[in-house]
């Protein structure tokens, strides 16, 4: 029920904000559709730094240094009745606290390429390819002297291909719907694959605990896919980007994978800005160990707040 409510809230939020497009925006968008063909490129890069230094501090605490970087790029082509949209989002963050080793706080690779051919009015026949992964290994730290590797580049990696309809009423909002989607989960690490991480088939052992077959490194699913994207200046110097992705495996349509990302960029001047980013994930095939020892699918949530240097181009 929580999952359904979160999904409905996400869709309502995106559609509601999209409906608030002003007449000026509509006029500008209409003009660009009629007159502008060719490439449109741009992006944003930001670097946030937080540092705490303590000397003889009676209240206690630890020195710390945190760095978070974000790069978001797009390159879109419009030519006649054809469109080709490409986007790349990269994020990385590290934390050094006290005498602990450097730990990762953020790591993201997200690439999407979508080609469309106009069908009627604001609808396009379209094909989409999406790739998600991370750059470096990820760990958890059960105690000060132990760390367990949980992930790595292509462990997991997600490759999704979809064919469907793309709704593009204006540049602010975009909705892609596909009844024909292939989702491939890649776990290119045998230890993680043997453990059945990220939903792949785990290794099999006989009664003497001798390995019979190794865990599968690839899992393929077929289902339906929805992707809603909103990019809007909600106030002067405040930009909102929201992306909602839903995938339902036809073999078990009652469980919907959810990926909802939000980025709010608040500009102070040409270079200084504050950013707030959140990501909510639910995947029924991923089991997560709770602090109380229970294992099962859980709603994952991440938020990153930072103030630093940014540049929009």
Where do the language-model regions lie?
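Sec-dependent signal peptide cleavage junction
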Residues: 15-44
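Residues on the lipid-exposed face of transmembrane beta-strands in outer-membrane beta-barrel proteins
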Residues: 43, 47-49, 69-77, 111-117, ...
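Transmembrane beta-strands of outer-membrane beta-barrel pores
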Residues: 47-53, 79-81, 90-96, 131-137, ...
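Outer-membrane beta-barrel translocator domains and adjoining extracellular loop/strand segments
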Residues: 54-59, 98-102, 138-145, 187-194, ...
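Extracellular loop and loop/strand-boundary signature of outer-membrane beta-barrel proteins
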Residues: 55-61, 96-101, 145-151, 208-216, ...
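Repeated loop/turn-to-beta-strand initiation elements of outer-membrane beta-barrel proteins
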Residues: 82-84, 122-125, 172-175, 237-240, ...
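Outer-membrane pore/translocation modules
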Residues: 104-223
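Outer-membrane beta-barrel "beta-signal"
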Residues: 299-313
């Amino acid at each position: 029920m929580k999952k359904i409510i979160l999904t409905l809230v996400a869709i309502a939020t995106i559609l509601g904000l999209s409906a608030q497009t002003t007449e000026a925006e509509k006029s500008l968008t209409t003009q660009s559709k009629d007159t502008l063909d060719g490439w449109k490129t741009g992006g944003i890069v930001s670097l946030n730094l937080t540092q705490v230094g303590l000397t003889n501090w009676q209240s206690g605490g630890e020195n710390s240094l945190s760095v978070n970087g974000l790069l978001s790029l797009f390159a879109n082509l419009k030519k006649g009745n054809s469109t080709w949209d490409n986007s790349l989002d990269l994020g990385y963050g590290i934390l050094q606290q006290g005498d602990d080793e450097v730990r990762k706080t953020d790591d993201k690779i997200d690439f999407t390429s979508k080609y469309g051919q106009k069908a009627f009015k604001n609808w396009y026949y379209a094909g989409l390819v999406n790739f998600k992964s991370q750059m470096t290994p990820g760990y958890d730290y059960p105690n000060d002297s132990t760390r367990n590797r949980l992930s790595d580049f292509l462990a997991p990696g997600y490759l999704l291909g979809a064919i469907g309809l793309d709704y593009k009423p204006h540049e602010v909002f975009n909705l892609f719907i596909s009844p024909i989607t292939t989702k491939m989960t890649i776990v290119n690490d045998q230890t993680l694959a043997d453990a059945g991480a990220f939903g792949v088939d785990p290794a099999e052992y006989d009664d003497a605990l001798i390995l019979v077959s190794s865990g599968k490194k690839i899992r393929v699913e077929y289902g339906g896919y929805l992707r809603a994207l909103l990019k809007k200046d909600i106030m002067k110097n405040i930009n909102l980007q929201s992306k909602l992705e839903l995938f339902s495996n036809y073999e078990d349509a009652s469980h919907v994978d959810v990926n909802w990302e939000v980025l709010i960029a608040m500009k102070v001047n040409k270079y200084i800005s504050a950013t707030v980013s959140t990501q909510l994930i639910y995947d029924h095939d991923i089991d997560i160990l709770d602090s109380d020892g229970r294992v099962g699918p859980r709603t994952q949530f991440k938020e990153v707040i930072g103030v630093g240097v940014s540049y929009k181009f």
